[in-house]
C-alpha cells in the first residue's frame, strides 16, 4: 500500500580524517570530511537491496518523509516511500548531501582543520568524481558492497553516470533523469550570470562574508531568479501567470508588477538562508567542467560494466533538453552499455523530474524491479 514514511532523521558521519584523507581528482585533499545522510527502509540480510539517491544542485539529504517540527516533506517524497516507485518496503534507500554542499556535508563554509577558520574560497575545486568518492565511503560505512541502483535527477543523474565510470561493478542499475553528459554553452552561460551576480555583490567580501557577518543575498537572489526560469517551461509560465498584472489601468511602475515577476521574487527570496552562495559557486562550476566522455579512461571503464542504464527526458525541459539524453544514449550504446531512453510528455519543464508526469513513476518502478 502506498503511504508515507512518517518522521525521519538526518544523520552525520565523519568519513575522512588526517590518517585517511579524501584525495581529490584535482590533486588536493580534505583531511576532514563529514557527510549528512538519511536512510529509509531496511537493509536485507544479503545487503543487496540498497538504492542510493543523488540529489540535484540545491538539494539535500532530506529526500522523503518528515522532520519533527516541520510540515515540509522531503523533496522526492512522491517517489520514495512504502509502495512508491522507490519502495521502502523492498529497498534500503540512502540519500546524502553532496560534498561541497551546505546542508550538513563538508563544503566551503566548513572549518578548515589547518586554520580553524571557514575554508571559503580556499576550499578546493571539486570534480564529479570527488562527490562520488565521498558517497562511496558512506556506502562502505553502511556495510554495502554493491548497490541495487543509484537514482538521480539533473546534477544527481550526472553523479550516477560518474559513479558507474569510477566503479563499473558497483551498481546493478543506473537511473538518470533530466540529466546530461556535458553542459551546453547556453547552460554554462546561465551559470556564469548567476556566479557573476553573487561575486559582484558588495557583501561577497571576496568570499569571506561569513567572517564579516554579512551575506551576498542580493546577488544570490538574482542568481536564483535567473536559474529558476530555466527550471520551468514557457507553457507552465503561460498557464500559471499569463500576462496578469497586480496594478490597475495606467498605474505603471518600475518595480515588480506582473505576476510572473512576483513569482520570481518569491523564488529568489525563499532561496536565501536555505542555500549558501559559495556552495552555489563551487557546484555550478563543477557542472560546467563535467564532460566524462572527453576522458580517455571513460570508454575503458564503461566497456567493462554490466550496469543497466535508464535515461528519461521531458519534452518541455529546455535546461537539459532531450538532445542531451539522445547524445548520452548514443555514447553509452557505442561502448556496448545496456541503455533504455525515453522522452516523456510533460508541461513542467526541467522540474518535471520532481513531479509526476504521466508514465514517469511507472517507468522507474518497472526498471528497479
From Swiss-Prot:
Pathway: Amino-acid biosynthesis; L-methionine biosynthesis via de novo pathway; O-succinyl-L-homoserine from L-homoserine: step 1/1. The record marks 319 as: Important for acyl-CoA specificity. Substrate binds at residues 224, 351. InterPro entries: AB_hydrolase_1, AB_hydrolase_fold, HAT_MetX-like. It comes from the Bacteria. Its EC number is 2.3.1.46. GO terms for biological process: homoserine metabolic process; methionine biosynthetic process. PANTHER family: HOMOSERINE O-ACETYLTRANSFERASE. Belongs to the AB hydrolase superfamily. MetX family. Transfers a succinyl group from succinyl-CoA to L-homoserine, forming succinyl-L-homoserine. This is Homoserine O-succinyltransferase. It comes from Nocardioides sp. (strain ATCC BAA-499 / JS614). The gene is metXS.
Amino acid at each position: 500500500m502506498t503511504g508515507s514514511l512518517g518522521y525521519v532523521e538526518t544523520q552525520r558521519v565523519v568519513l575522512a580524517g588526517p590518517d585517511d584523507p579524501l584525495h581529490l581528482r584535482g590533486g588536493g585533499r580534505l583531511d576532514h570530511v563529514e557527510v549528512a545522510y538519511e536512510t529509509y527502509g531496511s537493509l536485507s540480510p544479503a545487503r543487496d537491496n540498497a538504492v542510493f539517491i543523488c540529489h540535484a544542485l540545491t538539494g539535500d539529504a532530506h529526500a522523503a518523509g518528515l522532520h519533527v517540527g516541520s510540515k515540509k516533506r522531503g523533496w522526492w517524497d512522491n517517489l520514495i516511500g512504502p509502495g512508491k516507485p522507490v519502495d521502502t518496503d523492498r529497498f534500503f534507500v540512502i540519500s546524502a548531501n553532496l560534498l561541497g554542499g551546505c546542508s550538513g556535508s563538508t563544503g566551503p563554509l566548513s572549518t578548515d582543520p589547518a586554520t580553524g577558520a571557514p575554508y571559503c574560497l580556499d576550499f578546493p575545486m571539486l570534480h564529479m568524481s570527488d562527490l562520488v568518492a565521498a558517497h562511496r565511503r558512506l556506502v562502505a560505512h553502511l556495510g554495502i558492497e554493491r548497490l541495487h541502483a543509484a537514482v538521480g535527477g539533473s546534477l544527481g543523474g550526472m553523479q550516477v553516470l560518474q559513479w558507474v565510470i569510477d566503479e563499473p561493478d558497483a551498481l546493478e542499475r543506473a537511473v538518470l533523469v533530466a540529466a546530461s553528459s556535458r553542459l551546453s554553452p547556453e547552460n554554462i552561460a546561465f551559470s556564469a550570470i548567476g556566479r557573476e551576480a553573487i561575486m559582484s555583490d558588495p557583501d561577497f567580501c571576496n568570499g569571506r562574508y561569513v567572517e564579516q557577518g554579512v551575506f551576498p543575498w542580493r546577488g544570490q537572489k538574482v542568481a536564483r531568479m535567473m536559474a529558476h526560469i530555466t527550471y520551468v517551461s514557457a507553457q507552465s509560465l503561460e498557464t500559471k501567470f499569463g500576462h496578469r498584472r497586480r496594478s490597475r489601468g495606467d498605474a505603471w511602475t518600475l518595480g515588480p508588477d506582473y505576476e510572473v515577476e512576483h513569482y520570481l521574487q518569491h523564488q529568489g527570496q525563499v532561496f536565501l538562508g536555505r542555500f549558501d552562495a559559495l556552495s552555489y559557486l563551487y557546484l555550478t562550476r563543477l557542472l560546467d567542467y563535467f564532460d566524462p566522455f572527453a576522458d580517455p579512461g571513460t570508454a575503458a571503464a564503461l566497456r567493462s560494466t554490466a550496469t543497466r542504464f535508464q535515461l528519461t527526458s521531458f519534452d518541455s525541459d529546455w535546461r537539459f533538453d532531450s538532445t542531451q539524453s539522445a547524445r548520452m544514449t548514443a555514447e553509452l550504446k557505442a561502448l556496448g552499455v545496456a541503455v533504455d531512453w525515453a522522452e516523456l510528455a510533460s508541461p513542467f519543464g526541467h522540474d518535471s523530474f520532481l513531479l509526476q508526469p504521466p508514465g514517469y513513476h511507472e517507468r522507474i518502478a518497472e526498471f528497479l524491479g
